[in-house]
């Protein structure tokens, strides 16, 4: 279940959505970001092809930095330091591309990581999981193509957590950065400063090595909130004429294909709900409070619901049993956070109901099983903050299933408890008042056998 969802979270690091809205003059209302934070594991190797062209590690042309641009960078760095109250430990590293070159870099770095991140058959299982959850009908090949396009079109700039390089597309043959480019660079310079203060490279490496990204969404949201705020401060210095000029300088970032809506769900957390939380933190303690928040690791639930951030509501660890199943073995397991619930539910029941359910999450765990045919069997166990919140989460998943024509609903019988939704994917749901349990399988005979097996001291469904 989670491997692919996690990968989309990492994907969001690679390239964040570029939205069309302009920053509001009131700096307390944080502007919409136009850039992203990246995590490609490659390091930049600048090579001299000849005396006129310099390229990066993928052979993509890097543009020269004029003395005027260097002076602009110095001024923007000073601005970021003044607004954050923090100081760079070293001069930020940056690469400048043409727009097409930047898109080529985004795609190439993703494909380079793809080959390193996925073992044989793992990508196919990941996409099968997305199919079973009803997020997409795409094949593994088509999904890969969509994500490559997503990389190409969804970002106006990036900061790489690992090699700590800021990358921004600019116009060729100009001696000075235009206003749009400077605004994007301000945002990315904040990320560069955050990376130096916190050592984001080490933090990300630890998450990747353990394959546990539970702490990522919350910190990412705080990082984007601060970067958006500083960017809004910079844009607030522009008069109405310069704002219009900056808007006219914005490149066309539209995607050439229609991308699935759920691709953007993590960005709603980082740039919308995160901005709201960041605004409250800033209102309570100004920039010093945001600086302190960078060291915290809020849950996604705390970002969706700021009052839970300030009350420091804890995440509850939920134990789930690894079952002994004929012909199936455990392939992966992990924990669930509120972003996962919204990610699974939103496209079927809407954002409002999905988020309302997610902010009642106590905790959750999942286990994926696979057989020799690479068929998946997935189990999920969820707790709520209280019985009412658990019931709301249960109702949300039942509505999720009821709204899908691919399912036929079957009530429980004498052999098993809960509700079974039958179809090409079979979905079982049971709420015992303490935990919500879910199971998914593409084999109805296996599912019925699983639900009816109480030959041991406990039924299978007591996982």
Task: Indicate where each model-derived feature is located.
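Post-HExxH zinc-binding segment in Zn-dependent metallohydrolases
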Residues: 76, 197-201, 205-249
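Bacterial signal peptide processing site
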Residues: 18-21
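C-terminal motif of bacterial Sec signal peptides marking the signal peptidase cleavage site
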Residues: 14-16
